[in-house]
Structure formats: structure tokens, C-alpha cells
Amino acid sequence: MKKLIIIFTLFLSQACNLSTMHKIDTKEDMKILYSEIAELRKKLNLNHLEIDDTLEKVAKEYAIKLGENRTITHTLFGTTPMQRIHKYDQSFNLTREILASGIELNRVVNAWLNSPSHKEALINTDTDKIGGYRLKTTDNIDIFVVLFGKRKYKN
């Protein structure tokens, strides 16, 4: 009986630990990230970026694949950002992609600004759309994928 009580207590404590873990609200997190990027671009007198459903969908798919493969690369399975976007929408003719891993939401924009190629993507003047996704892996690591794009014609 004592063993059963100990096992039950252990199980209950683990269940309590699970319930105190906070799920990531990706939509809310992306609102925060989009807001930070918009604020940065506004301070620099750059054009406003419109949130694009296709770019968000592609970013989400890619973040999940990066998480499953435990890697960060712009060319997983030999695909480019443009190829991934064209799977859903052929009208895009320009894209940029920035990735981050292991950085908290409140530090990711500054981390990108400290990298010349990421900064160039953040403050680009040749795109007008944005879409991104934040993934929390089972190892509790954040993966961010943000795509910038421009269509050659209205979709």
C-alpha cells in the first residue's frame, strides 16, 4: 500500500509539473515580434510590412521541419525559401528569410540587428510582406522563422 501511495504521489507531482508549464501562444508571440519589427522600421522611416498568410504558412511548416531535424539552415532538404513559398504562391518574385534558435522572444530582434545579413533583411526596402512563426521544441528551444516577400503582381 505504501508503494502505491508513493507511486501515486510521484505521478501526481509530475502531473502538477506538467500543468504549470505554459504553452506558447504563437499568434500572440508573433504579434509582439511583428510589432517590434514594425517599430524598428518606422523609426528608420521604412515602409510598413503587411502580414501575409502564405508567408506565415510557409514559415510555420519550415520551423516545424527545422525542429524535427534539430537544425537551423536556410536550405533544409535542398530547398530555398523561394521554392518553399512557390509551393503555395507563384506570384512572389522576391524573398528574404531570417532564422534564429535558442534566443528568447524579447532578445531575437536585437540578435538579428547584430548580424549584418539578418539586419539587412530586417531593414530591407524591397519587400512589402512579412510572415513568421515561433516554434518551441520538445527540448524547450525557440526556433524563429521570418520571411519577407514581394509579389510581382497582386494575388
Swiss-Prot record:
CDD domains: CAP_bacterial
InterPro entries, per database record: CAP_dom (IPR014044), CAP_sf (IPR035940)
Listed Pfam families: CAP
PROSITE patterns given in the database record: PROKAR_LIPOPROTEIN
Alphabetized Gene3D superfamilies for the sequence: CAP (3.40.33.10)
Domain SCP residues, every copy: 37-140
Domain of life of the native organism: Bacteria
Protein name as it appears in the record: Uncharacterized protein BB_0689
